[in-house]
Amino acid sequence: MARKSFRVTMRKRKTSGGTKEKFTRKTNTNVRTNTKAKTKTPTAEMRARHKQQMKKVSDEAAAVIALKTICADSGVCIAFGYAQDKIKTYFKRFLDFRLVQSSRRIGEVSVNGFVFELAYKRKHYTSYAVLKNSANQGADNLVYEYVVGKYIDLEYSKYFPCLIETYGLFRYTNVQAYENAKQSSKLEFKSLVHIPERNGAVIDVDTFKWSCIDSRQHCILTQHLKGVISLGDVMSGKARLKNEMEIVYILFQVYYFLFHVRKDFTHYDLHEGNVLLFEPEKGKKIKYKYKLSDGKLISFESAYVVKIIDYGRCHIKMSDKFYKTLGMYCNPNQINSQGYPWFNKPGMYHINALEPNVSHDLRLYSRVKTSNAFPALQTLKPCIYTCEFGTSEIQTNNKYPQYIGNITDCLNELTTTIQQNSKGSIKTQNTIHLAHIQVSGDAPMRIRYLKAE
């Protein structure tokens, strides 16, 4: 209904004292003349909407209380894999950038790329992720790394604690947006487009094509543990381990995983910079129990959760299928120039993403052992590693009894060292445990987070 006009008129009138101005007002007939505002009676729809809003606030508050009860620090639980699904659900699988409170560059641009740390906050609960970017078109293609990461999430993450989760694949809107991010200390989220899974497929045809045109424009969002150090930091003297045996426990966690997946997985870029160490809580340890091939258990206490990162060169069970699909949309020159050279036989440095190699991932053991930074490794066998970045495969276990020839030999050597140390060590009652983790390799790991009890 149209409102009547509101106007002010002015006319003069005579008085005994002279002429005065008289104001008259014609107002909207629907407007009340009293000072009290008209109160609108709530409708059923308004009451229902208000009730829904209050329920949403109440549910969010309850979710925060529940999360803080079972996991005061999200990073600790994510490291263990404890309550991980609840945390991901609460933060909308980390794909909603409206929940990001802040972003910052971690380190400088290197040959490996550049990384942003994203801090997510919702109702006084915080968690972190990292956005990994390529440094140039020749760097390892992040579309393939995303595919490997999703495969690891599906096949291995419930069984082994040493892996990080991959959250999502993104693409910059254009080359300039990528260049701006490369030069900036903060991230502009409006320049990123999420590439969702469609019809059960991790990536689609358009993504394959884009990855061969300009691989720089893709980036991946992964799990992040704030405050981690790398094994490389320890080797360079920037950080120190809690005791001499820790290095043996760290290597055991890595090679136990590699042993169990050796037929279907090879990392192909396993060095000290790609092994992260997370100490969940100062002064507390994690009690690990691992089931060996003979059914026996081996146990030890460590201050660290170990994480293996950078999956851009890995061999996985579906690598051959990926390569065949890639060949349908990318020419050989693009495959070589856009970060896919590891699919070419025989492969540089004995790297071939199409086939496993049970010796190649000894690179980590070789570098750590020969660094002379860890006294606890001095008595362990050396390994056969023919060049700095790779080695040919030795399939036969214990082929050279005085040397380690493959990851099975390596795990056996580390197991023997831990068992011998356990016999000679004196048990103390003062150790405070933060969690118990039991790993069998053929069943989901069992996690007991003592702080949640």
Please report, for each region that a protein language model flagged, where it lies by residue:
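Conserved structural core of kinase catalytic domains
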Residues: I164-E244
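Short coil/turn segments at secondary-structure boundaries
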Residues: E117, V130, S134, Y178-K182, ...
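ATP-binding glycine-rich loop module of kinase domains
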Residues: N112-N174
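Helical subdomain adjoining the active site within ATP-dependent kinase catalytic cores
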Residues: H50-A63, S319-K324, Q334-E453
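Catalytic activation segment of kinase domains across protein kinase-like and atypical kinase folds
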Residues: H271-P356
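ATP-binding glycine-rich phosphate-binding loop
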Residues: A72-Y125
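Conserved kinase catalytic-core helix
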Residues: I152-D153, K238-Y268, E272, F278-K282
